[in-house]
Amino acid sequence: MNVPATRKDFMIVNMGPHHPSMHGVLRLILSLDGEDVIDCEPILGYLHRGMEKIAENRTIIQYLPYVTRWDYLATMFTEAITINGPEQLGNIQVPKRASYIRVIMLELSRIASHLLWLGPFMADIGGQTPFFYIFRERELIYDLFEAATGMRMMHNYFRIGGVAADLPHGWLDKCLDFCDYFLTGVAEYQKLITRNPIFLERVEGIGIVSAEEAINWGLSGPMLRASGVRWDLRKVDHYECYDEFDWGVQWQKEGDSLARYLVRIGEMTESVKIIQQALEGIPGGPYENLETRSFDRERNREWNDFEYRFISKKTSPAFELPKQELYVRVEAPKGELGIFLIGDQSSFPWRWKIRPPGFINLQILPQLIKRMKLADIMTILGSIDIIMGEVDR
C-alpha cells in the first residue's frame, strides 16, 4: 500500500495591492500553513510620488497644496507641520486668535480622521452598520471645513504666521452645536460596539504590543498610548495653545486591538472638550501676522514684455529660510508627524525629510501577525490605522 506523501510546503498568498481591506495600495506576501500565518512581507511604494524631493524645488506656500496629499484624511496636520518649521526657524509670533483657530481645526480634523478609521475598521471585522453611521458626523465636520476654508478636503488653510482667512459669521455657534450633537453620537458608538460580544471576540487579545516593544519599534500615537505609555506631543511639546485647555491623555495598558480602539474613542471625546473650550475662549484680534509677509524683489520690467503678460503680474509671497537645521513634530491622529528641515538662506529648503507615523507604525505588522489566524490580519492592520499616501509619500 502506497501512503501518499504529505506536502509541507507553505501556501503563498498575495493580499493586495487591490484588496478592499488594505486601506490603500498595500501588498502583503503571506506564507500560510492552513489558516495560520507563518510569515509576512509588506511591499510598499505603489503610491510613492517623491514628496521630499518636490519640497526642495518649491517655496513653503507653493508646497502647501502638495502636503495635503500625504494623509489626505487629516490634512490640517500636514499643513500645520509644514508651516511650523519656518515659523520656528524665523522666530515668528502667531497671533492668539490664529492659534485658537488652528487648534479648533486640528481637533476637528482629528475627529474626522478617527471616524473614518472606525467605520472601515468595523467593516473589516464584520460590522457593517457603524461604517454608515460615521458618515453622519463626518459630513457635519466637512460642512464646517467648507464654510471656513472653502474646501471639504485638501483645505490649504494654514499660513506662515496664522491662517488664510478668519472664521465666517455664525461659524462658532454652528461648531458648538456640532460638539453637543457629536457627544451623543460617540455614546451611540460605544453602546453599539464597545460591549458587543462578537466585536470583543474579534479584537480582545489580538495584536498585543507591550510598552517596551512599542518604544523599541518607535511607535507613536494611539499605538503607543494603547500599550501603557502616556506620551502625547500636545502635552510634551506645548505647541500652539493646548496648555490653556483642560483635557487628559487617553491611554490603555493592554496593548491589544481593543485597547487601540478605546484610545481612539476616548480621543474623540477629549477633542470635543478642547474644541468647546477654544470656542468659548477664542480672543479677538488678527488672524494672521502680516509682518511675516516678505516678497521677492521686483525686477525692472517693461510694461508689455513677455514676462509681464504671460508669467506673472504680481510677485508671489516667499519666505527666506535661515541657514539652520530643525526638527518639528505634531501629534497627528496616527502618531508623531515630523519634519526635519534644513534651510540655506533661500526660499527653497535644502532638505525636507518627512517622518510619517503610519510608515513607522506599519513596521511592526509582520511581527504582530505571525502565528495568528488569517482573519486576524484585518483586525491588526485596521487597528494600526495607516494611509498609504502618508506611508509611501
Swiss-Prot record:
InterPro entries: NADH_Q_OxRdtase_suD, NADH_UbQ_OxRdtase_49kDa_CS, NDH1_su_D/H, NiFe-Hase_large. It catalyses: a plastoquinone + NADH + (n+1) H(+)(in) = a plastoquinol + NAD(+) + n H(+)(out); a plastoquinone + NADPH + (n+1) H(+)(in) = a plastoquinol + NADP(+) + n H(+)(out). It is a peripheral membrane protein. It is an enzyme of class 7 (translocase). One of its GO terms (cellular component) is chloroplast thylakoid membrane. Keywords: Chloroplast, Membrane, NAD, NADP, Plastid, Plastoquinone, Quinone, Thylakoid, Translocase, Transport. GO terms for molecular function: NAD binding; oxidoreductase activity, acting on NAD(P)H, quinone or similar compound as acceptor; quinone binding. One of its GO terms (biological process) is photosynthesis, light reaction. Gene3D superfamilies: Cytochrome-c3 Hydrogenase, chain B (1.10.645.10). Coiled coil: none annotated. SUPFAM superfamilies: HydB/Nqo4-like. Its EC number is 7.1.1.-. It is found in: Plastid, Chloroplast thylakoid membrane. Pfam families: Complex1_49kDa. PANTHER family: NADH DEHYDROGENASE [UBIQUINONE] IRON-SULFUR PROTEIN 2, MITOCHONDRIAL (PTHR11993:SF10), NADH-UBIQUINONE OXIDOREDUCTASE 49 KDA SUBUNIT (PTHR11993). Belongs to the complex I 49 kDa subunit family. NDH shuttles electrons from NAD(P)H:plastoquinone, via FMN and iron-sulfur (Fe-S) centers, to quinones in the photosynthetic chain and possibly in a chloroplast respiratory chain. The immediate electron acceptor for the enzyme in this species is believed to be plastoquinone. Couples the redox reaction to proton translocation, and thus conserves the redox energy in a proton gradient. NDH is composed of at least 16 different subunits, 5 of which are encoded in the nucleus. HAMAP family: NDH1_NuoD. This is NAD(P)H-quinone oxidoreductase subunit H, chloroplastic. It comes from Populus trichocarpa.
